[in-house]
Amino acid sequence: MQRQAHTRKPKIPDAHGQVASLTQVVEFQQDKEQRQSMPAKFRAWFNIKLFRFKNFAVCALLMILVGGILNATTVLQPQFSQELLHYTATLAGEALTAGGVALLLIMPLAGIATGRFAARNILAIGFTLFAAAFYYTSTHLNLGISFGFSSWLRVVQVAPIPLCFIAITNAAYFGLPKEASNQVAGIINFVRNVGGSIFISLTGAIVTDRTLFHEARLSENMQLSNPAYVNQLTALTNAYSGVAGGPGAVASARGMIYRQLNQQAAGQAYEDIYRVLAWLAVGMVACAFLLSKKKPGEGAPEAAAG
């Protein structure tokens, strides 16, 4: 039996991979040297001792909530548009565009306000606007809204975000030494992402649960003893009789009513979740007053870590 000789091609080193690996080594070494130059208590990757400073701990909590609300609403509205308004993914994303433009316009104003007023006051205003925005959304959200009104709802929802984000980020550094700046920035960004993950999961679960709840309640009216249901069933049966006569028309009519029931139940579930977010924002107003009364430039409200 004749064996075929196989020639092995020499492996050519991946230049891009080597450069990337070398870059990671250099960055790790630089980070290690920077961490070693810090005081011992600030060398940990995440220094949880920073949470003993009340101002920082409150800011971390508020950032979890704000980041969670931002990410949850960014998922909820396109999800509502695609499932119930039958938007394409592209069209649902375009409905969020106006909110991004609003953020660009409001961000400089929020920065000016943060430099003049205490962070707790700005946050209280921001969370009050959040509560009003979500309540407004819950009372105006329906299955017949237009693309323009859907974009307007997004503008209303994101308008308070710059006030809250900038104020929390600035207030988180009050009372902390400069050596902890990197730690503060890292933890604040980390808890924001954690809050986003938690809220996306929770709001999705609540929407599903409330949809089932409303389906059960609405289905109680789908009885032959209900004149409204009988009239609707008769009208749809007559409409479908030309397409599917006899039992087929009745089945098609009941299917149409059931689809409408599912849509109404899902719409009410989205209204419920926005009401939940509104009440959460009301509670965040109270949390804002746990922060220091100091304005920017008035000095640290607490003693530096020693």
Describe every region a protein language model picked out:
Residues 1-31:
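N-terminal low-complexity segments that are often proline-rich with Ser/Thr-Pro
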Residues 22, 193-287, 292-293, 299-306:
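Hydrophobic transmembrane architecture of multi-pass small-molecule transporters
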Residues 3, 31, 39-44, 290-299:
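Helix-loop junctions on the cytosolic side of multi-pass membrane transporters
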Residues 21, 39-213:
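12-transmembrane solute porter fold
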Residues 32-36, 109, 136-140, 207, ...:
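Residue-level signal for alpha-helical transmembrane segments in multi-pass membrane proteins
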Residues 3, 27, 32-40, 206-211:
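Structural signal for alpha-helical transmembrane segments and their membrane-water exit/capping regions
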